[in-house]
Amino acid sequence: MAQEFKLKDVTSLQMKNGEKKEVEVEGVEGGKVLLLKVQDQVHATSSNCTHYGAPLVKGVLTPEGRLTCPWHGACFNVSTGDVEDAPALDPIAKYEVVEKDGAVYVKTTQEALKANRKFLNIKCSSVSEDKVLVIGGGSGTLGAIEGLRGGGYTGKITVISKEGYQPIDRTKLSKALLADISKAAWRQKEFYMDASIDIIEDEAKSIDFSGKTVSTKSGKEYDYSKLVLATGGTPRWLPLDGLKGDLGNVFLLRTLPDAQNILKAVGDNGKKVVVVGSSFIGMEVGNCLASMKNDVTIIGMEEEPMERVMGKKVGAIFRGLLEKNGVKFQMSASVDKATPSKDDSSKVGGVHLKDGTVLEADLVIEGVGVAPATEYLKGNSSVTLEKDGSLKTDESFAVNGLKDVYAIGDIATYPYHGPGGDGSPVRIEHWNVAQNAGRSVAHTINNPGSKPKPFIPVFWSALGSQLRYCGNTVGGYDDVMLQGEPDKASFVAYYTKGETVVAVASMMKDPYMTQAAELMRRKVMASKSELQKGVDIMEIGLPNEIKM
């Protein structure tokens, strides 16, 4: 039963609009709530983001009552607690708040305070004849199915995924080599069963778009009213001897079994590990394995890791962080081949570079990019794939030229309207983007005719320190402005094209990325000239109007 809990050292609800306070709850060990004032009304919510637990008092609060996590871009509506943007899945809790007798109280239960969240409840029985069929089992699927049920959809929802398990936190595969399904899964299977969501282990083979049916490799056929394609990406093998899947202990990293196989090969650690590719997957898994006391070398083609995306100066910061963790680098390098071990010719023993360098290897991990997983659509006369194998969509992620079909995540090329985008087609391989696209499609299905809600792409990475990034450089960038102390890996990097800031990256500077994303949504981000004159984006007020 709900009761009143007194807030420590709070005597009134006198606050300014936009103000946030994290306060302790008397009599509840570890109990905290967040007080916020929006549009002359004080709200009381749980104090931490439901994604990874970031303190929301350090987040960004907008005039209309949107609270954004300082770490990974999750957004909540402070009036309802509902999730507005990925990657959070559960809402924040809302508490009734009262002021009386010179003190302030929240009305709730002790269990609710300790939970520090509101657990999403989407239990229902399918009662309508509509059928949404989702192909894929990743982040986009997660956003779509939870968004559908959370938005009131009562039709049948079926998910076809070849992975054989419910949606997992795929970001932790490379960041932490998480290989336990009980820890990696966002929800237990019962959660989806209670929501009348059928998850089937199978793989799409072909689609009859006119007949609205999907055929699978097991020989079954599924019909649909609406189809959501969320099949993600397929990691690439290098087409080189020993590196195209033809030697043992050479791995890709995309699935839970991939992580399990890498850990099995690593064994008790102390192994020589060669990582081919100095982009995010390679850097993250290399850093993780070095932390486990393995001898790790990362091979990259550029002068600095992630130079094309992040710029040379920022890439050098990342390299320095990993070198402190014991990682070695071979940059500006080209791989020639991998050769077998002298002890076991079925397994890798070395990686050869084109300059003649040979790196000993007990195992090799390739992180050289992914291709859109759309093999089941090749040769289908009803659809035209882009050159990279993706599907072109409109702003609502509806596939061009098809009725009642949506594409999200790694396989979708959609018009980008963020700064510097101007509607240019872009394909973004970010966890947040896929999940937000799934949420957007769910909203469109639940509310036919509604306009899609725009979002700014966000990603993060674990590189010895936590990287945050928002925006996109689809149109390129011509300068990187670094502020802070880059030598201490504490900085904000502004990626500019002309006067426009098209992307922002930060380390140890929360919540600059979050603030930048909100400024971008409202088209009031500082210009390059303003930044050069010393404008601090944390001091720029957020207008009510969203202009994306």
Question: Where are the language model's segments positioned?
Answer:
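N-terminal pre-ligand scaffold of iron-sulfur
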Residues: M1-T62, V98-T109
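A Rossmann-like FAD-binding core segment of flavoenzymes
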Residues: V28-G30, T154, T158, A195-S215, ...
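C-terminal catalytic lobe of FAD-dependent flavoproteins
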Residues: T45, G349, D355-L385, S465-I546
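Short, well-ordered coil/turn residues at beta-beta hairpins
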Residues: H51-Y52, K58, A230-T231, M331, ...
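FAD-binding core/adjacent interface of flavoenzyme oxidoreductases
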Residues: P55-L56, P70-W71, C75-A103, K107-L133, ...
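Beta1-alpha1 glycine-rich phosphate/pyrophosphate-binding loop at the start
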Residues: V127-D198, F280, N287-K313, Q515
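Mid-to-C-terminal Rossmann-like scaffold of FAD/NAD(P)H-dependent oxidoreductases
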Residues: K131-V132, I411-T514, E518
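FAD-site-proximal beta/loop scaffold in flavoenzymes
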Residues: G245-N269, G350-H352, T357-A437, E530-V535
